[in-house]
């Protein structure tokens, strides 16, 4: 079995475009992956074209070899652009491997752990600007059976956050918590943009609202 083509599919969605990838083979078995890179799909497509040239003719079942060859292809690793494209391709390769063996991918990764997987809602707040509007949207989502809500209440703050912006964010979180009660989990998104002191400050301020998690408060390359 050999890789013959990698096809991208750009899908318009709320606030951004989703990018899906289909890896095709000479035996008719194909796999699908996803590697959306927010607002940068053209860069993603460029990285994907580079990967297609490198992967053409290879056996898609040699996932580890393909991944390491692509990752080590150049001295500069490519950061989130290349890694998003490589991630999408890797998903598709696992899909191909599972199909070729006649088993779901979770069996290849060690088998099933749970019979059901809980989900959370994102985008439920579309159009909301003020705390009261977020509360109204949250009530509507909870009424539809949603048990976990994720959103970023921090506006355009970057690295640090002003007292006014933090107060606005906390009022928003408070309004949502009051609207849905303790039975709905709140997942607060940071989008990896705060420095460590600010992230710690925000986390302490969020604690009274008992969020399930504070996601990506600092940049992914903030290793210290």
Regions found by a protein language model. Give the residues of each.
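Metal-dependent enolase-superfamily TIM-barrel catalytic cores that perform enediolate-based chemistry
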Residues: 116, 120-224
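Ligand-binding pocket scaffold of soluble enzyme catalytic domains
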Residues: 21, 27, 32, 62, ...
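Conserved, mostly hydrophobic/aromatic
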Residues: 3, 28, 51, 89, ...
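Metal- or metallocofactor-binding catalytic centers and their adjacent structured scaffolds
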Residues: 26-101
